[in-house]
């Protein structure tokens, strides 16, 4: 059996860290949504008991360091799977960008393996299992728009956001998420209004969504990396209704109602930033998963 499955990137419409927990993680409230910048995974069931990864991108490990490999290994051990798998990853999501590319790939792998290994697990069960690998993966298992709490693994579904344009810009720097959280001072930062964001999404109010965007991690990343702030400022100067850093960065995204204005923001960033994308909110469709027996 062979299967192909889409792994969409995500952005944080709001990201709040409330306090540091005893386990070392921060208690978070994040409203996230998937976008149509996506990787594609191709899974082939093998009779031989082995996991083979083939990543069509440089600098991405194909062994136990990869979240996809960890996801496959976890399912094999948990359910005593004797079959193997070959997984080919066609990468489009930038690496180490704050867009959950690795987490989304792992989520897609879990869903694909559930099919080709005939495990019969529900989405809820897959999401629960995924939290053993990484905090963002549970959201990626569900996709769409959702509130994530706890350390990011507790997911409450929300309606999809109204149609708009999203311009992404990733500078050629890397950011350490653990370092950003370590330097975050939760008592000395402006916190986003998560409830306002949720209400705006439920009401289909784009202007309310734009106004409620916020990310406490900007207080650290923008201070340490001025080029990230310059990208955000440039987006707003070219007409973005809202601009925000995704995750711990370094990617910044602009939210825009009209195509013509989005194109102006996109063109204003090309040449200024190495990687620029113009995308839409993700809508699940019939081509998300294809199965060949």
From Swiss-Prot:
ATP binds at residues 94-104. Keywords: ATP-binding, Isoprene biosynthesis, Kinase, Nucleotide-binding, Transferase. It catalyses: 4-CDP-2-C-methyl-D-erythritol + ATP = 4-CDP-2-C-methyl-D-erythritol 2-phosphate + ADP + H(+). One of its GO terms (biological process) is terpenoid biosynthetic process. Gene3D superfamilies: 3.30.230.10, GHMP kinase, C-terminal domain (3.30.70.890). Pathway: Isoprenoid biosynthesis; isopentenyl diphosphate biosynthesis via DXP pathway; isopentenyl diphosphate from 1-deoxy-D-xylulose 5-phosphate: step 3/6. One of its GO terms (molecular function) is ATP binding. It is an enzyme of class 2 (transferase). InterPro entries: GHMP_kinase_C_dom, GHMP_kinase_C_sf, GHMP_kinase_N_dom, IspE, Ribosomal_Su5_D2-typ_SF, Ribsml_uS5_D2-typ_fold_subgr. The keyword Nucleotide-binding applies. Its EC number is 2.7.1.148. The active site is at 10, 136. Catalyzes the phosphorylation of the position 2 hydroxy group of 4-diphosphocytidyl-2C-methyl-D-erythritol. Belongs to the GHMP kinase family. IspE subfamily. HAMAP family: IspE. This is 4-diphosphocytidyl-2-C-methyl-D-erythritol kinase. It comes from Listeria monocytogenes serovar 1/2a (strain ATCC BAA-679 / EGD-e).
């Amino acid at each position: 059996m062979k299967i192909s499955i889409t792994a969409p990137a995500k952005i944080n419409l709001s990201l709040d860290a409330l306090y540091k927990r005893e386990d070392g993680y921060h208690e978070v409230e994040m409203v996230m949504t998937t976008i149509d910048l996506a990787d594609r995974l191709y899974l082939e069931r093998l009779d031989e008991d082995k996991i083979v990864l083939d990543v069509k991108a440089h600098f991405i490990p194909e062994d136990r360091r990869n979240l996809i490999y960890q996801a496959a290994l976890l399912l094999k051990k948990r359910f005593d799977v004797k079959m193997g798998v070959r997984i080919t990853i066609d990468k489009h999501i930038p690496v180490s960008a704050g867009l959950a590319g690795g987490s989304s790939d792992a989520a897609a792998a879990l869903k694909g393996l559930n099919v080709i290994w005939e495990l019969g697990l529900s989405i809820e069960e897959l999401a629960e299992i995924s939290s053993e690998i990484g905090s963002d993966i549970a959201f990626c298992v569900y996709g769409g728009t959702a509130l994530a709490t706890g350390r990011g693994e507790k997911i409450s579904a929300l309606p999809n956001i109204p149609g708009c344009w999203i311009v992404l810009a990733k500078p050629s720097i890397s950011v350490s998420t653990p370092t950003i959280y370590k330097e975050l001072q939760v008592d000395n930062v402006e916190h986003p209004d998560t409830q306002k964001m949720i209400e705006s999404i439920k009401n289909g109010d784009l202007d309310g969504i734009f106004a409620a965007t916020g990310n406490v991690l900007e207080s650290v990343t923008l201070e340490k990396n001025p080029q990230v702030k310059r990208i955000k400022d440039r987006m707003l100067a070219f007409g973005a209704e809202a601009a925000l850093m995704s995750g711990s960065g370094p990617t910044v995204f602009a939210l825009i109602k009209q195509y013509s204005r989005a194109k102006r923001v996109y063109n204003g960033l090309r040449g200024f930033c190495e990687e620029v994308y113009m995308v839409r909110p993700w809508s699940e469709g019939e081509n998300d998963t294809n199965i060949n027996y």
